[in-house]
Structure formats: C-alpha cells, structure tokens
Amino acid sequence: MSEVTVRQLADVVGTPVGRLLEQLREAGIGVDREDAAITEAQKLQLLRYLRHSHGASVEIATPKRITLNRRSHSEIQVNAGGGRSKTVNVEVRKKRTYIKRSAILEQERLAERQREEEEAQAGVQAQQEREARLIAEEEAKRQAAEEEAKRQAAEEEAKRQAAEEEAKRQAEAQVKRRLDVEKKPKNGLEPARTEKPASRKAKPRFRSEDRESEQKQRGTKFGRKELHIAPGKAGTSKRKKFRPQKAAPAAKHGFERPTAPIVHDVSIPETMTVAELAQKMSVKAAEVIKALMKLGIMATINQVLDQDTATIVVEEMGHKPKRLQENTLELELVQAEQEVSRQVSRAAVVTIMGHVDHGKTSLLDYIRRAKVATSEAGGITQHIGAYKVRSDKGEITFIDTPGHAAFTAMRARGAKVTDIVILVVAADDGAMPQTVEAIQHARAAGAPLVVAVNKIDRPDADPDRVKQELANHDVITEEWGGDTQFVNVSAKTGEGIDDLIEAILLQAEVMEIKVSAEGPARGVVIESRLDKGRGPVATILVQSGTLRKGDILLSGVETGRVRAMLTERGQEIIEAGPSTPVEILGLSGTPNAGDEAVVVPDERRAREIAGHRQAKEREVKLARQQSAKLENMFNEMEEGEIRALNLVIKADVQGSAEALSDSLTKLSTDKARVKVVAAGVGGINETDVNLAVASNAVIIGFNVRADAAARRLIAEKGIDLHYYSVIYNAIDEIKGALIGILDPEYREEIIGLARVDDVFRSPKLGAIAGCLVIEGSVRRNNPIRVLRDNIVVFEGQLESLRRFKDDVQEVRAGTECGIGVKDYKDVKVGDQIEVYERVRKEPAL
C-alpha cells in the first residue's frame, strides 16, 4: 500500500485527524483534507520533521545488525533392533548474523583512534620516565660526591688523631723507661708478676662491639695491650673524650599537677546513676558512694539517684550543681498553643462536697431531675460524676464527689478543677469529719464556699447549730459578718433549691470566669474506666478551647484520636466547649484521674511526649525503690516475721481502684500488712488470675466480674475471689481476713496454788509433795510452776494427783493432796506449786 489517506494514517498512528493535518502543514506538505492521499516520500518528510522538532537525528535510524534464526524439521528412520525401526524427529537450528558494513568501518575507525591515543600517551609516559631517571642519576652522583668528601675528611681526622696518640705514647714510654732504670734492683733480678685470670665477659649484643672488644684484648705481639706501657699503668694515660649529651625529649603527655582543687559545673538531670554522677565530677565512683554513705544512703554503682540527692552530693564534694529541666517537650507543647485574645464567659464548675449520707447526690438529683442516688450501690456515691445543668438564668457544671473517708483523693481532685464548692451539711447531723476535710480541700484549691444546709424538712433539724459548728472552722455566714453564703435546702421537698442556684450564679458572676473558647482544647480527667465493648473511656472536663471529634488527645502517658464524644446523658456530640464534661473514646489506655488532657497538633508529637513521660515515670519509680537504704535493712530482716496478705484489685473506674487500694493498704500494722500486688480497671481476666497465682494473692472485684476463661482458671487453681459493690464491706472483710492470718495469742491464767507441807518418797514416782490447796483448784495434767521464796525454780507438768491413795482429777481449796511433779525431785517443804492453764485469745490488729 503505497498511498494512504490522512484519516487512515491518523488511525494507524493513533492521533486526531486535525492534529495530523496541522503537523503536515508545519512539515511543508500541502495536504488539507481528510481524504487526501499521502505518498511514502511525504511520510518520510513528516517523520524527519517530527524527529527534528523532538531534538533527534534527522536521519532515519536503520538497523546495524540483523540476526536470522532458521529452523528445519525432518524425520529419520533408525534401526531399533529385532527387525524394528524407530522414527526420530530431527530439528536443525541455524543462526546467521548480518552486520552492516558501515558499522564495521566505524568500529575500525574507533579502534584506530583509540590505538593512536594509547601510543601518544605511552610516548608521553616514556618521556616522563626518562626525565625522572636522569634526575635520579644526578641526585645519586651528588650524594656520592658528598659521601666521598665526608669520608676523606674523616680519614684526615683519623690520621691526625693517630699521630697525636703516637707522639703521646712515645713520650710516656720515655718516662717509663727512666723510672724503670731508677727502680731496678741491684742484683738485677725482677720479681715475677702474678696476674689473675680475666673473667669471661658477657657476650656483646652486636657483632661490631664483639670485634672491637677482640681487637682491644689482642694488644701487641709482645702480649701487652699498649706499647711501652706497663700493664699496671695501662689505663692511667687515657682520658675520656667529652661527648655532649643529648637533652631528654619532653614527655608528650606530661601535665602539671593542679595546686588547687578543680571545681566542675555538674549538670544534674531528674534521675541519674552513681556512675554517671562520678563521671561528670571526674572522680571515682567509690568517692561518690563514700559521700552517700556519709549522708546515710547505702548505694551501689548502678543505683539511680533523684535530682535532690544528686544535688546534695555534688555540693558536699565541692562542685557546683546545675539542675536540668527535662520537660523541654512539655514547654514546647505549651508554647505551640495558639494564643487567642478573645475571652468568653464560661459556665461555673461547681463541686458538691460533704460528709457521707448528708444528701449530696439527692440534692444534685433534684436539680438535674434525675434519680442517680437510687442506682448507687449501698445508697452512697462511690464515683466522681460530672453533669451540666441548664436553667433559665444560666448553665452550671456540677461535679459530685464521694463523701466516704476512703475517697479523699477523689475529693481533692474535684476541688482542684472547681470554681465554687457547695458544702452540703445535714441540719440534723452537723459538721462531721469529711465536712472538715472538704473545707480544707476547698481552701487548698482557693475556691469559695457556698454552704447548703440540707434536710431542713426533718423535725430535729437545727440550722443554727450547723452555723455554730462551721464557725468553729472559720466558715462564717454573711448574717454574722462573714463571707460565706448559707442556704437552707431540702433535697426531698425541693425547698430552697432555686435560692441555691441563684447563690451559685451570683458567686460566679462576681468571679467573672472567662476563658478562651478557640484554639486547642485543654482539660482534666475526672474519671476513667475500661468498657468491655468500647475500650478505654475517660470522663474529661474541658477547661479551655474547643474539643472536636477527630482531635489528637494526650493525657498523661496515654494518647489517641477522639473517636466519639458523649454527654452525661449518653448523647453523641461533635464538639465540646469550656466547662463541658464529656466521655471520650479512642485513647490507648485508661489515664489516671487528675491527669491533664491537651490536644496535640500531630500524632507523632503526641507519641513522642507520651513515651518521654513514660520513661520519666519509670525512672522516678526506680529511684523511689530504696531497697538498699540503711533504714530499710532492718525492716527487710523483720519482714520474715510479719504476715502479709497479697491482693489483686480490679475496679470499674480508676478512682475507685485508687481509693480501695489506699484504704486497704492503711489496714497494715506491725503484725500483718496488706500488699496490693496490682490495681487496675476493667473486668477480671486470665492475666489477673495468673498474677494472683504467682503472688499467692486474693482477687477483689469492685463492681466488676470475671470472664468465663478467668472463672475456669480460678476454679482450677483454687484462687480466692471476692466481689464487692460497697467499699465498706470490702474494708471490713479484708480486715477480718488480715486478723485470720495472724497466729493465735495465748494468755496464762492461774487456777490454783498449793503449799508443800511435807515430802514423801515413793518407789514408783519418786518425791511426792504433801500439799494443802490454799487458792483455787489443782487439776491434773495442767502445767505448773514451783516457787521457792516467790521465785520460779521449775516449770513443768503435774504428773500425779492423789487424795488418800486415790487418783483424782481435781482438788479444791482447803483440801490436802499429794502432788507428783514430772521430772523434778527437788521439792522442799515450804515451796509453793502454782497451777495455770493457757487460754486462747483472738488476735487483734
């Protein structure tokens, strides 16, 4: 097909017809219709134009190498033996490669050019080698000439020294001959000389030294070591040449000892080991341990020290401590928060506090129009709850706290996050211990008090008595010139409720509570629990900013994205503003009640801060373990005698677990102690049971139950499991169990006293004391004491008791009897025999 139309070519190359016509016009081909024909020459012209426009070579690339593969098949008949033939298929493969002549010529030209370059490079290299060789020869000649000149100078110096030595020897020889002539004896005889044989010298280290020593020992042919010199005076004329000594090289690593102690600036983190502290002060670890022992702390080289202890040690050793703050990430988080200038009023956070059973929850129920008190176990509040109430005059956020003594930490947390504290006091009961404690918490938090005198509908109500008792604790009503509002209310009839709300709103208006409603949210964890279906659930009171669904939340060491937010009524919301209590789903675990919750920009940053807090918490925990301290050594030695009751506590919420753990730990005494192995939130699972098995502990479930797998394991291992819903019952039963593990106590009671009037001898029993019972009664087989002059001389057992040769079990006062004491024969007249019995006494804590 030599000619094709424009449309056909566009279909083949896959381009629009209009685009192809435009490219043909740009290439100089006069075609402007879709059905116009295009020749092969026009196709090549278009291809050259496109190559040129794309930056490629205009020449059409042609293959430089062609490879042809050819296969042929045939069959041959092969004799298979036995008159049979076999057909074999034969395949012949042929491969031929044809190379374009121009490509071969190009390769030859490239090879020739490369060969010429190599030859030129070899010539240059040979020239450089020749020049280097000539330079080396000239240098060798110069060095040879210098050596020859040195050798000649040395020979001349040697000849001069030899001539001087020869002249010196001749002069000494003449002097020697003259002296010999003067000292020669008259008879002409010379006494024979005796020489000691020379001792063998040590082998020289070098051969040259060996040769020199041999030459010196050979001497002259006459056997003398020097010419014309007597052997005894051979060394007198020699003088050693003066040789200048080389100065000793200075020590490379030499240093001068400091004349005064060096004072270091020691940076101290929050926790560090003894070895790290010693390294920073440039001293040995033993010095630091010695300083710690002076402070009364037994430490090892790997002991973790807290910042305060390390600071004292550094100061004691004469250095300057510098405390390091490791909360850089925390400070960056605070600085990264958006500062919003617009401030808005928020609802007042009101905490209801008071003694147990004074009607706090009932009062809040009437305000909320709900029935929470009826659902509380035992009729007492054991959880901290947060509720938001809307009235005609404004919104109020209420926090209900438990009144029982075990929930002190809960009340303290409630007072910290509050603006106003409502102190509920029963009009018929007055101020009680938890009432006074609530006053102290409110003062510590700096929150104003509003006293609600409850139960005024009772006939024995006495509001004036309440005012008088509270005045003793510096809570004075406005009627008496104080600054505290007193409102008489009744949670049963609703009397005074409106006055109480009005008093709260008035107090909030005076305080002018304003915060920023924009920017990242910040709040505090009121309570947390582990829900079986939803996972960790935390009740958070938003204090500033706006918390939205999907935010990254950081609380203590737990992080997570807010998956859902629920109100106290179970309604799901998208966002929560200031003073709004919400339940949060999505955290990685249950945070501790009282932890601060803050929104972080990204998840990576949140995990980094949480990891840093977790490591810091672990280091602080290790630092607090003072197992090696001197004051704990004796306690550890005595622990073998102290009975311990191990407990594994699981509760529905974090606050209850904390309160129960603290209350049970306080039951410990010198005789028995309660050790909480673990306290957590959520149902009882297999992990808790295995922990109880390993530590021999009792499992306590507070408003939680064990799952099926845990129940099977409990039945298999025989673990003691107790369920409680009221904290009173848990404390009472654990107290009883603590008494049960103590050893029983025995008290000795004297039941009789007998006086020995005579002593008889019995062949069977030995000494028999004839006694008169003067007090009580004497019983057989009871333990006795023998008293002599009111001093105990023997303790033993009463073996026989007779009256007129008859064995009796008991002899009363005023009756005579015979008493045989077991294993004691030294009874004397006038002794007293005291009979007593051991009475078991129930132990007490």
Swiss-Prot record:
Region of interest (G5), residue spans: 490-492
Record's GO cellular component terms: cytosol
Cell location: Cytoplasm
Keyword Protein biosynthesis included in the entry's annotation: yes
Sequence segments annotated as region (Disordered): 139-253
Residues reported in the UniProt entry to bind GTP: 354-361, 400-404, 454-457
InterPro entries reported for this sequence: DNA-bd_dom_put_sf, EF-G-like_DII, EFTu-like_2, IF2_assoc_dom_bac, IF2_II, IF2_N, P-loop_NTPase, Small_GTP-bd
Basic and acidic residues bias spans: 139-198, 206-228
Residue ranges, annotated region (G3): 400-403
CDD domains, per the entry: IF2_eIF5B, IF2_mtIF2_II, mtIF2_IVc
Broad class of where this protein is predominantly found: cytoplasm
Annotated region (G1), positions in chain: 354-361
Family stated for the protein in its record: Belongs to the TRAFAC class translation factor GTPase superfamily. Classic translation factor GTPase family. IF-2 subfamily.
Biological role stated in the UniProt entry: One of the essential components for the initiation of protein synthesis. Protects formylmethionyl-tRNA from spontaneous hydrolysis and promotes its binding to the 30S ribosomal subunits. Also involved in the hydrolysis of GTP during the formation of the 70S ribosomal complex.
Record protein name field: Translation initiation factor IF-2
